[in-house]
């Protein structure tokens, strides 16, 4: 699998093999996606990652890399299917784009990794999911505002020192059916 490597403005620099991602330098960025999956009760699905990979044991939303020349939406739909067993059809009907290319940095061991993250929101009727046991240890459903506080606190893989309010407001709007921007495949 190849990953595209970008500069901070999102311009493609080069392609690397997945195994080389920890070798990117401080001026290079990868692209990824993340999704607030919300049930009818207004609870957000929080994953606890298994103790391996880039974010061992961390709390997270459904997230992943953009592989090769995938679009952001294709990557998000793939991750929803892989990690949670959500079908392409369901994801395409209800997924909403909330923010594109949020600069995001986190430590993996001693290495600082930089991502340009596209944030999505998926409101669904069911809380039933099928976990990808190779990546996810367990899930919990937390109320929307409690999830926002968890992210702000730095207890997830998301950086603590970022102003998330614009994203949180868009997620609230999706939950309250005020956000109607569908994504294109």
Where are these regions (language model features)?
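Nudix hydrolase/Nudix homology domain
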Residues: 55-58, 68, 101-104, 111-185
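Residue-level structural signal for beta-strand termini and adjacent loop
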Residues: 18-19, 50, 135
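Short loop segments at secondary-structure junctions
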Residues: 9, 39-42, 50, 123-128, ...
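A structural signal for short, well-ordered beta-strand segments
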Residues: 35, 62, 96, 118-120
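A glycine-rich, hydrophobic loop/mini-helix early in the fold
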Residues: 32-65
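Acidic, metal-coordinating catalytic segment for phosphate/diphosphate chemistry
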Residues: 1-34, 38-40
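The catalytic Nudix box helix
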Residues: 46, 61-97
């Amino acid at each position: 699998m190849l990953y595209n490597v970008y500069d901070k403005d999102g311009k493609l620099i080069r392609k690397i093999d997945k195994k080389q991602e920890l070798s990117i330098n401080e001026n290079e960025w990868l692209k990824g996606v993340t999704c607030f999956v919300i049930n009818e009760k207004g609870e957000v699905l929080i994953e606890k990652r298994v103790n391996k990979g880039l974010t061992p044991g961390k709390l997270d939303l459904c997230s992943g890399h953009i592989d090769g020349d995938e679009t952001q939406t294709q990557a998000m739909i793939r991750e929803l299917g892989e990690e949670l067993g959500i079908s392409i059809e369901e994801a395409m009907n209800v997924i909403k784009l909330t923010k594109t290319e949020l600069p995001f940095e986190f430590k993996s061991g001693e290495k600082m990794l930089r991502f340009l993250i596209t944030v999505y929101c998926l409101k669904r009727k069911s809380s039933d999911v099928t976990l990808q046991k190779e990546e996810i240890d367990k899930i919990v459903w937390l109320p929307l505002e409690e999830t926002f506080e968890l992210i702000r606190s730095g207890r997830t893989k998301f950086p603590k020192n970022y102003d998330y309010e614009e994203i949180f407001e868009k997620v609230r709007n999706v939950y309250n059916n005020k956000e109607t921007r569908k994504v294109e495949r």
